[in-house]
Amino acid sequence: MCIRDRSLRADGITKKGGKIYLSASNGKVLNSGVIAANSQQNQGGSIRVTAENIQIDENSKISTVGKKSGGLIEIGGSWQNSNKDVFQATKTTIAGGTILDASAFDMGDGGEIVVWSDIHNSNSKTTVKGTLKAEGGKIKGNGGRIETSGRTLDIDDITISTKSTLGVDGQWLIDPYDIT
């Protein structure tokens, strides 16, 4: 499955952002465009990308930003593999210049971002070189949470923000077997 230089959107205006699921279980997902499930007046939506091999190219943008709270972005798996229905990637690559954003922009908590590959598979590798944000709203709200996990994890050029202007900063969970 390939999304090249295109936009795939499920934005909400007064309602919560929509849901976008891209799945190629034993195949490959390649994205070099915009995938968005934002909301101008409510909570950001959810985006899930699952495949054996996931490649998010340079300057891609994936966002679930919302006024009242950030949404959910799952690339390659779920938080700590908590949802067994979500297929786990073997290789997940987020290129430099990419932005993943699950922030609240006004008065809510930041959302959740997971970039994952199967930590139990000896061939698994997660590489993240982009910017990941799950920030709390500017008026009020706590920071969200971000997880980067894989058997081998390369986060050499990553930028992370779970900050909150007036609330509590969020968390970044790093869960590799081997890290560079």
Task: Please report, for each region that a protein language model flagged, where it lies by residue.
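Extracellular and secretory-pathway beta-repeat/beta-biased strand scaffolds
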Residues: R4-T180
